[in-house]
C-alpha cells in the first residue's frame, strides 16, 4: 500500500515459494489470489529457481489431507513419502528393535502419525530424539528437478499460473514471468558459474565433523520407541524445528536472471523486467529465445500477453553456456590475493566452446475456467519434447498448437532448454539407496562423513533455462 500510494516504480518478486523450510505444509497461492494481496502492476515476475531450489513443478500430493474438522495423514505415493507417515515408521522400527510385539508396534505407529499430524507445524517434535537419517526421503518431491526442501506443491509456479479466483471480482490472475537468483545470503550473486566450493558458493554449510553444526544428534540408544503429544499452546513463541542436516542436501549454487535488451542500461533492463522479456537459468549462462511467429502485428516474444484468431506457431532458439576452465583469466585486472578473497581463485573463465543443448521441453497450462476445476488436469508437463541435434550452433525448433482455437480457452506456454548432463553441487539431494521395490531404505546426507562426505557433493545434473511464458486467449472469427 505504501508503494502504491507514493507512486514509486517498484517490482515485488516472490521467491522460494515452494520452499517448505519456512512455509507451512498446507501453504497455497489461493491465499494470495485476491484483489487485496495481489497487484499485477507490481507483481508480474516470480523466482522459479534459486540456491534454495526449484519452485516450478506442481504435484497433486499433499503433506496432509484436509478433512472435516482438521487434517489427516495421507498414505505414501510412488513419488512422495509424507513426513507424518514416516513418523509412524520411525516409531514402528524403534518399537521392533526394542522387542515390542507386532500389534503393539502397529498401534504406536498409528499413534505417532496422529501425534505428528495434530502437532502441525511442529510435528518433528513429536518424535523424541529424532535423527536426520530416520526420516529417509520423507517430505521431498522425488521426481522434481533440484527441488526445494520439504516441497509445497500448491505454492509452486505452475499451480499459481493455473489458479483462478471466481469469487473476488477484483482479483487478477497471476501472470508471472520467470527469473532465477542465487539467494545465498552472502552478498555474492551469480555463484552458479562453476559447480565448486559448496561451503562458499551455497547456503549448505553442514559438516558432520563440526560438533556445533551436527547439533549433538542423539544416538540410537536414546531412540525412544513411542511418540509424544505436543501442546501447540506452548509452541506459540517457538520457531519451527530446524532440519539443518537434511536441508544441506537441497541447497545449490543458484540461478540467474537473463534479460532481452537492445541496450545495456538501467532503463532497458527495467523495461524488460516490466514486460517479462526475461528468463531464468539454473546458473549457467544459457541463451534462450521463445517467440510466437504468426501474430498479425508481428513476432511476440516471451512474456507477451495477447489474443489470436488462429493457432499459434512458436519458435525456440537456445544456445548452451560456454564451457569453463579452472582458475581465472590472465587478463584479469585483480591481483591474486583479491581473487582468492572474492572467489577462492575461481572466476568465470570461459573458452570458445559451448555445452550442448539436448532437447527443448514445452509446457502447456490451461488456467481454470470454473471453480475447483482440478489443477492436475490443466498442467501438461511436458506437453511436447523436441530433441536437438548436437551442435555448437545451438538448437532451433518450431512447433504449433493445432488445438488452440478448438479448446476456446486461454492457454499459457513456456519452454525449458535442457543442456547435456554435467556435475553439480547437491544434485543427488539425499542420495537414497533403494531396495528392489524402489523404496528408499537409507540416505546419504551432503556434508556427512558417513554420507556423501563433507566436500561438494557432486552428481550428474541437467542444467537448464526456463523462458517466461506467453499468455494467449482465443479470438474466434
Protein language model regions, located:
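Short, small-residue-biased leader/transition segments that mark boundaries at the very start
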Residues: 1-3
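C-terminal functional module detector
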Residues: 5-11, 16-477
Amino acid at each position: 500500500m505504501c508503494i502504491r500510494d507514493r507512486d514509486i516504480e517498484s517490482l515485488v518478486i516472490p521467491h522460494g515459494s515452494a520452499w517448505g523450510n519456512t512455509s507451512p505444509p498446507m501453504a497455497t497461492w489461493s491465499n494470495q489470489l485476491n484483489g487485496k494481496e495481489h497487484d499485477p502492476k507490481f507483481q508480474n515476475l516470480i523466482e522459479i529457481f534459486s540456491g534454495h531450489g526449484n519452485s516450478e513443478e506442481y504435484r497433486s500430493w499433499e503433506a496432509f489431507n484436509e478433512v472435516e474438522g482438521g487434517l489427516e495423514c495421507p498414505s505414501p505415493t510412488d513419488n512422495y513419502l509424507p513426513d507424518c507417515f514416516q513418523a509412524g515408521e520411525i516409531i514402528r522400527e524403534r518399537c521392533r528393535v526394542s522387542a515390542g510385539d507386532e500389534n503393539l508396534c502397529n498401534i504406536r505407529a498409528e499413534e505417532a502419525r496422529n501425534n505428528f499430524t495434530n502437532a502441525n507445524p511442529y510435528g518433528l517434535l513429536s518424535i523424541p530424539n529424532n535423527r536426520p537419517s530416520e526420516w529417509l526421503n520423507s517430505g521431498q518431491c522425488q521426481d522434481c528437478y533440484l527441488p526445494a526442501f520439504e516441497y509445497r506443491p500448491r505454492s509452486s509456479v505452475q499451480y499459481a499460473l493455473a489458479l483462478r479466483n471466481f469469487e473476488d471480482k477484483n482479483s487478477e490472475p497471476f501472470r508471472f514471468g520467470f527469473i532465477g537468483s542465487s539467494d545465498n545470503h552472502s552478498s555474492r550473486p551469480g555463484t552458479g558459474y562453476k559447480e565448486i566450493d559448496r561451503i562458499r558458493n551455497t547456503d549448505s554449510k553442514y559438516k558432520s565433523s563440526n560438533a556445533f553444526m551436527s547439533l549433538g544428534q542423539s544416538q540410537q540408544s536414546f531412540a525412544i520407541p513411542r511418540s509424544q503429544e505436543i501442546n501447540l499452546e506452548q509452541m506459540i513463541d517457538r520457531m519451527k524445528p530446524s532440519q539443518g542436516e537434511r536441508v544441506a542436501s537441497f541447497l545449490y549454487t543458484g540461478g540467474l536472471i537473463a534479460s532481452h535488451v537492445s541496450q545495456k542500461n538501467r532503463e532497458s533492463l527495467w523495461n524488460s523486467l516490466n514486460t517479462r522479456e526475461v528468463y531464468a537459468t539454473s546458473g549457467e549462462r544459457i541463451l534462450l529465445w521463445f517467440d510466437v511467429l504468426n501474430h498479425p502485428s508481428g513476432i511476440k516474444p516471451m512474456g507477451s500477453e495477447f489474443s489470436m484468431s488462429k493457432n499459434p506457431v512458436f519458435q525456440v532458439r537456445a544456445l548452451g553456456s560456454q564451457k569453463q576452465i579452472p582458475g581465472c583469466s590472465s587478463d584479469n585486472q585483480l591481483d591474486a590475493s583479491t581473487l582468492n578473497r572474492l572467489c577462492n581463485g575461481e572466476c568465470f573463465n570461459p573458452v570458445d566452446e559451448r555445452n550442448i543443448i539436448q532437447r527443448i521441453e514445452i509446457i502447456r497450462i490451461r488456467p481454470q475456467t470454473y471453480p475447483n476445476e482440478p489443477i492436475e488436469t490443466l498442467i501438461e508437463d511436458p506437453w511436447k519434447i523436441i530433441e536437438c541435434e548436437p551442435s555448437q550452433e545451438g538448437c532451433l525448433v518450431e512447433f504449433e498448437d493445432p488445438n488452440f482455437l478448438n479448446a476456446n480457452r486461454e492457454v499459457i506456454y513456456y519452454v525449458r532448454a535442457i543442456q547435456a548432463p554435467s556435475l553439480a553441487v547437491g544434485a543427488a539431494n539425499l542420495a537414497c539407496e533403494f531396495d528392489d521395490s524402489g523404496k528408499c531404505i537409507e540416505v546419504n546426507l551432503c556434508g556427512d562423513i558417513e554420507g556423501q562426505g563433507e566436500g561438494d557433493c557432486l552428481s550428474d545434473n541437467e542444467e537448464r533455462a526456463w523462458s517466461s511464458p506467453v499468455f494467449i486467449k482465443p479470438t474466434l472469427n
